[in-house]
Amino acid sequence: MKGQKHENGPSEADPVLVEIVAGTLAAIEKEVETSIGRTSRSPMIRDAHDFRAGIHDRKLRKLTGRSYSALVHPVVRDYPIETMNVGDVYFHNDVYLSEGGIGHLPDLCVTVPVFAADPDSGEQRVVAFIQAFGHHDDIGGAVPGSMPSAATSVYEEGLMVPPIKLWDRGVPNESALKIMTRNSRMPDSLAADLDAECSACLAGARRLSELFDRYGVAAVEACFDAILASSTEVYRREILSRIPDGTYVWEDYAEHDGVDEPKLHRQRITLTMDSTAEVPLTIDFTGTGPQARGPINHCGDYADGNFLKKWLAPILRNLAETPERMAQLDVNEGVVPLIEMRFPQKGTLLTPIFPAPTNARTFVILRLLGVLAGVLAKATGGRMPADQETIRYTGVHGTDDAGEPYLMREVLGGGSGGRWYADGEDTIHVVPDSRNLPTEFTESRFPFLVERLGLAQDSGGPGEFRGGLGYDKQIRMLRDASFMSIADRSILSCWGVKGGRAGRPFSVVVDPGGPRERELEGLVDDEPVLAGEVIRIRTTGGGGWGDPLDRATDA
C-alpha cells in the first residue's frame, strides 16, 4: 500500500488502512512521550512521569486513547486554524481559559499544528494537532512548587499565561520565555522542560505529516472518522448496555480545602441511563457543594464538559465482559457523543468563579472518578471496583550543602480498590500513570536518606477481594528543610463495595517516636523538619470488594 493515495476514494475507510493509521497514531503518541521523558530535566517530568501527550484531528477531536491529554479548543479559539503556519508552537497554562483541559498552573501545555497538502489546491493546511502538557517544577507563586495549600486566589498560584504563540515558524519567542523563566524559582529546569515538550511535539507533527503524505488527506481523515465511530459503537454495545435503565445517585466528599477548618465538601452525581435515547448516559453534578475558599476547585463546566467526559470514561471500562476486554478498550472522542453532562450554577467546586484557586483540584477530579464508580456499582449490583485514592504530592525543599536551593516533589500512589474478580493492585499510580522517584536518584541529588520504601502492611480494606496496599516511606533529613503535602483521604477512608471494608487513610508523621513527634494534615506548605528527623508517609489503601468472610482461605 506504500505510496497509494485515496484522495477521491469511497467514504468508507479501508479497514486495513484503519488499522495502520490507528497503530501509527499510538506509536507517534508514545514516541512524543518517550522523547519528553528522556530529554526533560526536572524529576517531576523525567522520573515521576507527570506529563501527557495527545493527538487531535482538525475538528479538535481526540484520536488516541492510550493517554489522557488537554484540549486544543482554547488555542483555536484565540488563533484560528487559517492563521497557523508550519513550525508554530502554541502555549498556555491559564486554568480559566483552558476549557477545562488544564487543572492547575504548573501544568504547562504546548500545541503544535500538523500540516499536509490540501487534495484540491495542493497548499499546506492544518490537518491535526500534537499536544503535550507536563507538571513543571515551579511557575512562581507564593510557595516553591507553585502549589500553595492555603491559596485563596489563583493569583497566588503562579504565572497565568493565556494561549500565546511560543514559536513562530520555528523561531522561539525569546521574550515570552524570559518572562516565564524570570517568574520561576527553577528557571533552568523550566526552560529545559519546555524545550523538551516543544521539540517532542514538533517531531511528532513531522511523523504525522508523513502519514498524510503517504496515504493522502482524505483517506487518513476517513480513518479518523472510522476509529472514533468504532469507539462509539463499542461503548454503546458492550459497556452502556450493561447499565439498567433508571436514575441513580451517589456522593462523596473532599475533607478540607487548606484554608477553612476541615469540613466535608460534597461531590454528587445523579446518573440517568436511557438505552432508547440517542445520548443514553446523563451525568448530572447538581448537588455538588459550593466552591471552596481553598485551592480544591476544578473548572469543569467548559466545552460542554468535553474534558470531564474523557476523564471519567475510563471508569466505564470496568463494565466490560472480561478484564482482558477491558484492557483493549481505549477512551477517545468516540465516547463524547454518548454522554451528556449537566452542571450546577456557577460558584460550585466544579463551576468556580474566577479567581478561585485550583492547584489542589485533584481532590475534586479524583474524587469524581470514585463517585462515578460508586453510582455505577449501585446501578450494576457491584460490577465496579471499590474506592481508591491513588495520587498525592509530597516533597521537601530547602538548601543543599552548597547553599543552593532545591525542590524535591514526588507523586506517591496508593492501593486500588478490590474488584469483582481480583484483589486491588498495590502502590499503583492510576492518575496520571506516574511513578515514585528512584531512591538511588533522590539520595544522590537531595540531602536526605530513604530509610524505608515498602508496602504499608494491612492498609488495604478487607474483603472477598482485598484492597491494594499503599506505600510506607520514611526519609531522614540530613539538613533542616520544609515539608509539603497535597493529599486527601487523611480522614475519610476509601470505601468498600458489596460488604468490603474501608482501607486505611493517608498519614504523615514527622519525628515518629521522637520528642517532636507530630501528625500532619494532608494539606501542608512549609512544615519545618530538622536535620536528623524522620518523615514517615503512609498512603491510602484501597477499599475491599465483597464480604471478607467469603475470601478464599488460601488467598
Feature names for model-found ranges:
Residues 2-86, 91-92, 96-121, 126-555:
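Glycine/proline-enriched, intrinsically flexible loops and inter-domain linkers
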